[in-house]
Amino acid sequence: MTAETFFQLFNQYGLILVCSVVFCEYMNLPGFPAGVIMPCVGVLIARSELSLPLTVFLSVVAGVLGSLVIYAVCYWGGEPVMEKLFGRSKKFKSLVRKCHEFIDAQHGRGLAIIRVIPCIRTIVSIPAGLLRMPVKWFVGWSAAGITVWNTALISFGYFFSEK
């Protein structure tokens, strides 16, 4: 595949790919590290016909939707579902417990703050669901944090790429 063919494909399917990767990442599926992928997306956008603001917006929507899946599972499934999914990992449980305490102390803004901290930003949906945070708070604060994170990473790649 030539570089020209790759960019043509990215122009056609890039937004679908970006949204799919972001959605999966916020659902905590392994293999989707935003810290690596999002700056690369910015570079690709700079070299394509895609819009930076549209890409950031759609990545935020995909991130919120992916987060809502985990939030809903924990909201309605509670501790038994979390135990079933992550019961063996003491480190993971410890991170979730720390996020839980931080959100409980900081309320909604704690959720937005955690959304920009690598390694724990995607698991914050779990304690938010377990705490039964109101969905409008969850979506609002998640969108705020995800917007900051995705904008920073995609813009980094976009503005520091050689056009």
Spans of model-derived segments:
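Structural signal for membrane-spanning alpha-helices in multi-pass inner-membrane proteins
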Residues: E25, G42-V43, L153, G157
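Membrane-interfacial helix-loop-helix
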Residues: M1-S20, R47-I126, L130-V139, S155-K163
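Transmembrane alpha-helix interface/packing and boundary motifs in multi-pass membrane proteins
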Residues: C19-M38, I113-I114
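Hydrophobic alpha-helical transmembrane bundles that constitute the permease/transmembrane domains
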Residues: P33, C119-I123, A143, T147-T151
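Residue-level hotspots within the lipid-embedded alpha helices of multi-pass solute transporters
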Residues: Y26, V60, R115-V116, I146-N150
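Alpha-helical segments in transporter systems
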Residues: V22-Y26, V139-G145
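Short amphipathic helix-loop junctions that connect adjacent transmembrane helices
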Residues: I37-A46
